Design a protein with these regions (language model features):
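An N-terminal assembly and electron-transfer interface module characteristic of large anaerobic redox
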Residues: 1-162
Length: 162
């Protein structure tokens, strides 16, 4: 194959190229001031004790954890399950991965421009990790999360990546 390529001859690769499914862009939210938003994170923040048994690498699960009544993530009890970054800082302040402190400030602000306000924050956040994940498994996780959000009447999401 190398010799053919160097000689400008046709060649066939020994490794098949994977064609990814194209995901269409979602339409804009028509009326943000009536919208319910959810927080989604890939930081691996989970409820204390890791009740959904996330794996630090090649995780195939997602979880949904209550933030009802919390002003920020430091008020809750959380663990971080992720091997793609140093979790020391996230364990010290989970707001880095689930920016509840900032979203609550945004939610309460009366000074936002029209069209930037939203009606409410969904009282749970969604979490998973993608480090070392197989694409098909991550697509499955994403589809399950999206179906759950749709069934809960969530209009949009704030996706926090690590």
């Amino acid at each position: 194959m190398l010799m053919a390529k160097l000689s400008d001859q046709p060649f066939v690769t020994e490794i098949s190229v994977i064609t990814e499914e194209v995901t269409p862009i979602a339409p804009s939210i028509r009326n943000m001031e009536k919208a319910c938003l959810a927080i989604i994170t890939t930081s691996g923040v989970v409820a204390q004790g890791n009740p959904d048994k996330f794996k630090a690498v090649s995780n195939t699960k997602w979880g949904k954890y209550s933030i009802h009544g919390l002003k920020d993530m430091k008020e809750g009890k959380w663990d971080v399950v992720h091997s793609g970054y140093d979790t020391v800082y996230m364990n010290a302040d989970p707001n880095y991965g689930v920016p509840l402190d900032m979203v609550r400030q945004f939610e309460a602000s009366q000074e936002l421009e029209k069209g930037c306000r939203f009606a409410r924050l969904y009282p749970y956040f969604y979490s998973s990790t993608g480090v070392g994940g197989v694409t098909s498994a991550m697509q499955h996780v994403g589809k399950e999360m999206a179906q759950n959000m749709k069934s809960e009447g969530i209009d949009g999401a704030i996706l926090v990546s690590t």
